[in-house]
Regions:
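Phosphate-binding glycine-rich loop
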Residues: 25-72, 86-89, 96-98
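Conserved donor-binding loops in enzymes that form glycosidic bonds
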Residues: 6-7, 98, 127
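Glycine-/small-residue-rich active-site loops that bind phosphorylated ligands and cofactors
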Residues: 9, 27, 79, 102-103, ...
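Generic structural signal for small/hydrophobic residues in well-ordered secondary structure
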Residues: 17, 39, 57, 73, ...
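Solvent-exposed, non-membrane alpha-helical residues enriched in polar/charged side chains
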Residues: 18, 22, 36-40, 59, ...
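N-terminal "arm"/small-domain region of PLP-dependent enzymes with the aminotransferase-like
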Residues: 1-25, 30
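Active-site phosphate-binding strand-loop segment of PLP-dependent enzymes
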Residues: 102-160
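Conserved coil-to-alpha-helix start sites within the AMP-binding
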Residues: 78-84
Length: 160
């Protein structure tokens, strides 16, 4: 197989990487616990849980929002398929909203126009370091008693 790209790994991480690999705690343990604490400090929120992937995190968020077969989730087509696949995996229907032609982000007015009795959640994607209009979307969601799920993989550390 020809690799599409080679991951760069500086020699300075070798010792620490080997220490983690040989600890037996690859998916959980001291380093993950410390990372979650540091991340919580960074965000000012102690309730941090790391997941193996962004897709896994979105699957969990959809479960917590009680999204199931026959429900609708408003999302954007301007994203990686990994954002929308968990919606289908939950048995729900993806309802795409329009995107703002300047930012490429979900248009809050379009989101509101797509809401039906079956709408259970809004899946926002903060993209390219630009956060969506959270304030407006949260206002819409509250008005219609709909959960908001945010995919921030492309805007980590951005502020609104």
């Amino acid at each position: 197989m020809i690799p599409q790209f080679k991951v760069f790994m500086p020699k300075t991480v070798d010792d620490e990487l080997l220490r983690v690999l040989h600890s037996g705690f690859i998916g959980q343990g001291e380093k993950v616990n410390q990372f979650e604490k540091d991340l919580g400090d960074y965000f000012g929120n102690k309730n941090v849980l790391t997941i193996n992937s962004g897709t896994g995190a979105l699957q969990l968020a959809l479960r917590l929002a009680n999204v199931t077969f026959g429900d609708e989730v408003i999302s954007t087509p301007m994203t990686c398929t990994a954002t929308n696949m968990p919606i289908l995996a939950a048995g729900a229907k993806i309802v795409w909203c329009d995107v703002d032609p300047v930012t490429g982000l979900a248009d809050p007015d379009s989101i509101e126009s797509k809401i039906t009795k079956k709408t259970k959640a809004i899946m926002l994607v903060h993209f390219g370091g630009i956060p969506c209009d959270i304030e407006k979307v949260n206002k819409i969601a509250k008005k219609h008693n709909i959960k908001v799920i945010e995919d921030g993989a492309h805007a980590f550390g951005s502020s609104y």
